[in-house]
Regions:
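Cyclic nucleotide-binding regulatory module and flanking cytosolic helices
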Residues: 2-47, 92, 98, 130
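A residue-level structural signature of the nucleotidyltransferase/glycosyltransferase Rossmann-like core
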Residues: 18, 26, 62, 84, ...
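Cyclic nucleotide-binding regulatory domains
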Residues: 50-113
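Residues that scaffold the ATP/ADP-binding catalytic core of kinase and kinase-like folds
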Residues: 37, 73, 95-96, 127, ...
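Polybasic "coupling" helices that flank or enter modular domains
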Residues: 112, 128-183
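Nucleotide phosphate-binding site architecture
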Residues: 35, 53, 117, 125
């Protein structure tokens, strides 16, 4: 069955109406809550190497990846870079907006290309109110994201390079939903 994308009032293609929800946060919402958010979501294709955010710049939109995987990269004063987080189909890029911030301390760069839903930061702020279904799902994701970052830091300190590469490959597989990806 072919999925039709109909133009919205702004002329952008709408998200696929018949397609299953592939982002973990959006999929965890009740169907009525997801349908309420749908007009605020724009389906976009993220390209490998695309910079979504630059460090210390305003976050204008958040992204809910489907197949895409985005790395959060920290750059030290002397120019060295470190991957400090990976976000794929389980999460949201731009979590600082949910946490009350307006900027990101890190650069967000697409590692694996694919689809994502983009939502304006102001729309997310309005939709995340105390006790809302979206707020509850984002809180659960935030707790999980922090645990994954903690595990990643421990792995980088205590494991050999082969083990770290294996963890990274498994993470890419989990977060992209694909066994194949470009390197």
């Amino acid at each position: 069955m072919a999925v039709r994308r109909t133009p919205t009032r702004e002329g952008r293609p709408s998200p696929p109406a018949a397609a299953p929800v592939r982002n973990g946060i959006l999929a965890a919402l009740l169907a009525t809550e997801y349908q309420r958010l749908l007009p605020k979501l724009e389906h976009v294709a993220l390209k490998r190497g695309e910079i979504i955010y630059r460090a210390d710049q305003d976050i204008e939109a958040v992204y809910f990846p489907e197949e895409a995987v985005v790395a959060m990269i920290d750059t030290t004063d002397d120019g060295r870079t470190t991957e400090v987080g990976i976000i794929g189909r389980e999460g949201i890029v731009g979590i600082n907006i949910f946490l009350g911030g307006a900027v990101t301390p890190d650069r967000a760069i697409v590692q694996i290309p694919g689809g994502a839903f983009r939502m304006k930061s102001n729309d997310l702020r309005k939709d995340v109110r105390f006790g809302s279904p979206l707020q509850r799902v984002l809180l659960q994701y935030t707790r999980t994201f922090i645990a994954v970052i903690s595990q990643s830091v421990a792995c980088s300190q205590h494991h050999h390079i082969e083990q770290r590469v294996a963890r990274w490959l498994l993470t890419m597989n989990d977060y992209s939903g694909s066994r194949e990806f470009q390197m």
